[in-house]
Design a protein with these regions (language model features):
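Flexible, glycine/small-residue-enriched loop-and-beta-strand segment within the central core
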Residues: 2-114, 143
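C-terminal/domain-terminus segments
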Residues: 111-145
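Short active-site-adjacent structural elements
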Residues: 148-149
Length: 149
């Protein structure tokens, strides 16, 4: 865990081994970074949560292993000048906060990207890449993720 003062983890949570939760302090943003994880969450091993903006995860969320939840990337992909700079040397860029509702199930190796909301009770399939909002109680899968039920 990096950036502990910006991270809240609820009661009765289980975080699998080799997982990383990082809140990057970025003075250029007007609001402080925040990662909030609700009570009763269970995350599989090799989980990676990284924020420069805000990630709010509701209660009783479950994930498979190797899930990525990230509100940021290294540089704005539309900025052609950055393409000649190594990714780890580019400024960190966020397209918006992530909100994951209560009782969401996220399959193995899924990626939840910046600026999305996943509604309560939704299911995200294994290997899905979530780039748009997912309504409550729906099932989404694919790259990019789309509603399948």
């Amino acid at each position: 865990v990096n950036g502990k003062k910006y991270i809240e983890i609820g009661d009765y949570c289980l975080i699998g081994r080799n997982s990383h939760i990082t809140a990057h302090e970025m003075p250029q943003y007007n609001t402080p970074v925040k990662i909030s994880i609700g009570d009763g969450c269970m995350f599989g091993p090799d989980m990676h949560i990284t924020a420069v903006n805000s990630i709010r995860i509701g209660k009783n969320v479950r994930t498979g292993k190797s899930v990525l939840i990230s509100d940021n990337s290294h540089g704005d992909p539309k900025d052609m000048a950055l393409r000649n700079i190594a990714p780890n040397a580019r400024p960190i860029y966020s397209k918006g906060a992530i909100v994951i509702g209560d009782n969401v199930w996220i399959g193995e190796k899924a990626a939840i990207l910046a600026g999305v909301t996943i509604g309560e009770g939704a299911i995200i399939g294994a290997n899905a890449v979530v780039t748009k909002n997912i309504p409550p109680y729906s099932i989404a899968a694919g790259i990019p993720a789309r509603i399948i039920k």
